[in-house]
Structure formats: C-alpha cells, structure tokens
C-alpha cells in the first residue's frame, strides 16, 4: 500500500516520498515520463496487499510467505531504489503533464 511504499522510500531516501512525487514528471500520480520509477510502480500495482519487509545491512528485504505480498513488496522496493538512484535530478517544482509528448507505454 502507499503507506508501506512511503516507509520503504524513507528507508532508502531519508524522507517519506510518495506525496512529493504525486505531480512529478509524466507518470507520477496514478496513470501518470521521467523518472520511470512511477510508471514501473503503477504497472506493478495494477497487477497485484500488505506485506512485510526489513532493512538488513543497508538493503531492503521483502519477507513473508505469500508470493503475492512478496511481489508487491518487490514493486515498492524497486521503485524506492529507483528514486534513490535518481535523487540528484529530482526537481521539487511540479511538472505540467501537458508537456508530456510521449504516450504511456504498455505495462
């Protein structure tokens, strides 16, 4: 869920990010080009509940026995790490989606 996604981002970025990215780029916000972190995350959520994770020696580790919960956790983990990898290019100013020229890719 979005709260857990925010917690994972907080673990790797030091801040609770989901709301910072709601109007960022062409993909952030449901259905919303760069970074594609949001796009990949939206596609993943569209295919999949609460899950467990931990931070072990600096890495996020998805836990639990349910394969669907692990898959959802992995969606959040990959997006959180994508945001971490792209944090140097993050611009806090909202990006007008009208500037997006490309159509959204199929998941």
From Swiss-Prot:
Active site per UniProt: 41, 76
EC number: 3.1.1.4
GO biological-process terms attached to the record: arachidonate secretion; lipid catabolic process; phospholipid metabolic process
Presence of the UniProt keyword Cell inner membrane in the record: no
UniProt name for this protein: Acidic phospholipase A2 2
Regions annotated as coiled coil: none
Binding site for Ca(2+): 27, 29, 31, 42
Localization (cell): Secreted
Tissue: Expressed by the venom gland.
GO MF annotation list: calcium ion binding; calcium-dependent phospholipase A2 activity; phospholipid binding; toxin activity
Cysteine pairs bridged by disulfides in the record: 26-100, 28-38, 37-82, 43-107, 44-75, 62-73
Similarity comment text for this entry: Belongs to the phospholipase A2 family. Group II subfamily. D49 sub-subfamily.
Reaction(s) catalysed by this chain's protein: a 1,2-diacyl-sn-glycero-3-phosphocholine + H2O = a 1-acyl-sn-glycero-3-phosphocholine + a fatty acid + H(+)
Enzyme kind, highest EC tier: hydrolase
Organism: Bothrops insularis (Golden lancehead)
Gene3D superfamilies registered for this protein in UniProt: Phospholipase A2 domain
Keyword Disulfide bond: yes
SMART domains noted in UniProt: PA2c
PROSITE patterns assigned to the protein according to its UniProt record, in alphabetical order: PA2_ASP, PA2_HIS
């Amino acid at each position: 869920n979005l709260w857990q996604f925010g917690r994972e981002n907080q673990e790797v970025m030091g801040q609770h990010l989901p709301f910072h990215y709601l109007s960022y780029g062409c993909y952030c916000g449901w259905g919303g080009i760069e970074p594609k972190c949001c796009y990949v995350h939206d596609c993943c959520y569209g295919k999949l509940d609460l899950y467990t994770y931990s931070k072990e020696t600096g890495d996020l580790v998805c836990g639990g026995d349910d394969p669907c919960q692990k898959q959802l956790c992995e969606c959040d983990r990959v997006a959180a790490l994508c945001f971490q990898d792209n944090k140097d290019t993050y611009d806090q100013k909202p990006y007008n989606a009208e500037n997006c020229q490309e159509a959204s890719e199929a998941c």
